[in-house]
Curated annotation (Swiss-Prot):
Gene: mzrA
Protein name per UniProt: Modulator protein MzrA
Subcellular location: Cell inner membrane
GO cellular component, one term: plasma membrane
Lineage of the organism: Bacteria, Pseudomonadati, Pseudomonadota, Gammaproteobacteria, Enterobacterales
Originating species: Edwardsiella ictaluri (strain 93-146)
Entry-linked NCBIfam families: PRK10629.1
Calcium among keywords: no
Residues forming coiled coils: none
């Protein structure tokens, strides 16, 4: 009689453990996947506006942004120029001001927005009205 009563108790314990494990897996996946569903990165692209003008040195750009408190994720070269990915999108305006002040005339700085989701990645320049011509303002 004791064996008959202990079997249902063991089965209930097994189901509770399986249910607990499933809930843990769902919670862990939610924590990992949820931030990836709608991530937006703000980048700036520096391009030469004149033929023969070289792309600015990435280390120089990094140094100037860092000196002014702008945190960046990466600086990479692409076929059109230099792409600077900002660590904090709210620092975009400060980064633009620093680059406009530090770069010599002949460079264009444009916003580039990267939308990432779990299933889709889109990289496109922002509206043309957000393009700036760098150089010292006197």
């Amino acid at each position: 009689m004791n064996q008959a009563n202990s079997q249902p108790f063991t089965r209930r314990q097994g189901w509770k453990r399986i249910l607990g494990l499933l809930l843990f897996i769902v919670a862990a996946l939610t924590v990992v996947i949820l931030p990836q569903l709608g991530h937006k990165e703000v980048s700036l692209q520096i391009r030469a506006t004149h033929n023969g003008l070289a792309t600015p040195d990435g280390f120089f750009v990094y140094q100037k942004l860092d000196e002014n408190g702008v945190s960046i994720t990466s600086i990479t070269q692409d076929r059109e120029g230099l792409v600077i990915r900002l660590a904090h999108p709210e620092q975009r305006t400060l980064a633009l001001q620093v680059l406009q002040r530090e770069l010599p005339p002949g460079y264009s700085i444009a916003d580039k927005i990267l939308h990432r989701s779990l299933f889709y990645k889109s990289e496109r320049p922002a509206a043309a009205t957000l393009s700036y011509s760098a150089g010292h303002n006197r």
